[in-house]
């Protein structure tokens, strides 16, 4: 017997979700001669679930989902003895941007920034989050710390390549971000990882912004 949830596509292009129970049908001789399926439409419930873990402005994952999924990612990586990379970032001088360009323009920056992060991810095991305000994070896995740093630098470049003018940014004429990167074997990660990444982020800010500080 197989039980699970399936995402399907309607002819009109809309998606719908079903919960399915599939079990084999046997002949008198005990051979499988077919399958029977029971399906329940759970689209409304799935939409509510998705809304509860999605940031309303940017449509990327929110802080609630970060708090839920991050420990699971770490525990899964521990079983496989893998590295986990946590890239914590903050848009440089965002308050100055809001004060001078207006909150509507500020919201547009937040949306473009989030879209850039999401489009920079390559694998289903990589996650982008808006943690609140102008704070974002990416959780991803790389084979080596060097590759993790390389990917973080790609993210930083992609953000500046958006070419969103920010006359009040001391680091660049455009929107940029300061970042703190923690890349460790999952078995060496403890509950201080968020604070450690936050400390690195603010070290990046103190050092001139638009840069990445990495754990030793």
Residue ranges and their predicted role:
Residues 20-22, 39:
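Sensory-domain boundary capping and coupling elements
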Residues 50, 63-83, 114-122, 141:
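Short regulatory alpha-helical coupling segments
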Residues 28, 103, 145-153, 169, ...:
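Catalytic-core segments of nucleotide cyclases and related cyclic-nucleotide turnover enzymes
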Residues 105-125, 135, 154:
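Active-site-proximal alpha-helical element of nucleotidyl cyclase-like catalytic domains
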Residues 7-16, 26-27, 30-41:
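PAS-family sensory domains
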Residues 127-130:
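A short pre-motif secondary-structure segment
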Residues 49-68, 89-103, 111:
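Conserved nucleotide-binding and Mg2+-coordinating catalytic segments in signaling enzymes
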């Amino acid at each position: 017997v197989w039980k699970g949830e399936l995402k399907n596509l309607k002819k009109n292009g809309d998606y719908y979700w079903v919960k399915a129970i599939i079990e084999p049908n046997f002949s008198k001789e005990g051979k499988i001669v077919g399958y029977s399926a029971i399906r329940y439409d759970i689209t409304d419930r799935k939409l509510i679930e998705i809304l509860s873990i999605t940031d309303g402005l940017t449509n990327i994952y929110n802080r609630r989902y970060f708090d839920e999924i991050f420990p699971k990612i770490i525990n899964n990586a521990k079983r496989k003895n893998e590295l986990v990379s946590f890239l914590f970032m903050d848009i440089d001088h965002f308050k100055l941007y809001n004060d001078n360009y207006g909150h509507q323009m500020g919201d547009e920056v937040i949306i473009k920034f989030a879209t850039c992060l999401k489009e920079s991810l390559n694998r289903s095991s990589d996650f982008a989050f808006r943690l609140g305000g102008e704070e974002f994070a990416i959780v991803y896995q790389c084979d080596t710390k060097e590759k993790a740093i390389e990917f973080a630098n790609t993210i930083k470049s992609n953000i500046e390549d958006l070419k969103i003018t920010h006359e009040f940014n001391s680091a660049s004429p455009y929107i940029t971000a300061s970042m703190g990167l923690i890349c460790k074997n999952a078995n060496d990660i403890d509950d201080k990882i968020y604070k450690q990444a936050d400390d690195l982020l603010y070290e990046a800010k103190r050092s001139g912004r638009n840069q990445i500080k990495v754990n030793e």
